Each structure stands twice: as C-alpha cells, then as structure tokens.
Regions:
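Polybasic, low-complexity association/targeting segments
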Residues: 1-12
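Short alpha-helical scaffolding segments that buttress acidic/His motifs in well-ordered protein cores
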Residues: 8, 22, 26, 40-45, ...
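Mg2+-dependent prenyl diphosphate-binding active-site environment of isoprenoid biosynthetic enzymes
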Residues: 21, 58-67, 116-117
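Short glycine/serine- and small hydrophobic-enriched flexible loop segments
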Residues: 24-28, 63-70, 124, 128
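Acidic-glycine-rich active-site phosphate/pyrophosphate-binding loop
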Residues: 25-43, 93-99
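Phosphate-handling active-site elements
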Residues: 29-40, 65-82
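Glycine/serine-rich anion-binding loops at beta->alpha junctions
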Residues: 44-64
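C-terminal binding/interaction regions
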Residues: 80-136
Length: 136
C-alpha cells in the first residue's frame, strides 16, 4: 500500500484530483495509459467542476469499480456499487455528508488533512470489493 500512496502523491503533485488519481491507479494496474480518460475524469474534480458536490473519491471509486466489472452481471455490479456507496456514506458520516463541501467543512486545509487518506481508503475498499468477487 505504501507504493500506492507514493503513486497517489506523485499524481497529486501533477495536479490530479481524487477521481483522476483513482482512475489512473486502475490504468496502472493494467499497464495502460489513457490521458483522454484521465482528462474526462477531471470533470468530477472537487465535487463535479469544483462545485463542492459529490466527492471525487466517491465518484472515482465508483468508476474504478465499474472499470474492473467486465464480465459481471449488471445486477451484481450494481450491488457492488451500492455496497461501496453505503460504505462511503458511513465513512464520511463524521463530516455530515459525502460531498466535497461537507468533507472539507469550509476549511481548504482539510483537503491536505483528509483527502489523501480518504482516497487511500477508497482504493483499499475497491480492491477488497473486487477481490471478494474474484476480480482482483
């Protein structure tokens, strides 16, 4: 996991945000590179276009799971995504919600204090969910 965290920091220094980092990690796992996809994931940055909406770790995690869901029945995939969302909702309850605004609680320094650990936890949860289904 230390290598993953190091890679997350490297991507963050390049200007990537949560959803982009998670999708790049998915691509890395397959030895792929797709700058167009990473650019598209930028639409999810900071709660969709920096609006403070749904956290990019949540939306990026959902995209990460869907990326690796090839071969799953749609209902099985949706069940996995719901399980992930339920976990994320519980994980972020201490902040009062799952939006970027709630997680940051109006303090921009919370981005440094909270987001890296949250993205790392999301990555671990996604790996766990995929592993449970024989996909990782």
């Amino acid at each position: 996991m230390d290598d993953v965290f190091g890679r997350m920091l490297e991507l963050s220094r390049k200007g990537y945000f949560c959803a982009q980092i998670l999708m790049q990690l998915a691509l890395d796992a397959e030895g792929k590179d797709c700058p167009e996809l990473i650019r598209a994931m930028g639409g999810l940055n900071a709660g969709i276009g920096f609006s403070g909406g749904p956290c990019g770790a949540l939306t990026g995690g959902a995209c990460f799971l869907a990326y690796f869901s090839e071969g799953m029945e749609p209902q099985e995939r949706d069940t996995m995504l719901k399980e992930f969302h339920d976990w994320f909702r519980e994980r972020t309850a201490e902040y009062g919600g799952e939006s970027c605004d709630r997680i940051l609680e109006g303090d921009p320094t919370n981005q440094l204090r909270r987001c890296p650990a949250l993205v790392q936890e999301v990555y671990a949860k996604c790996a766990e969910l995929l592993s449970e289904r024989g996909l990782a």
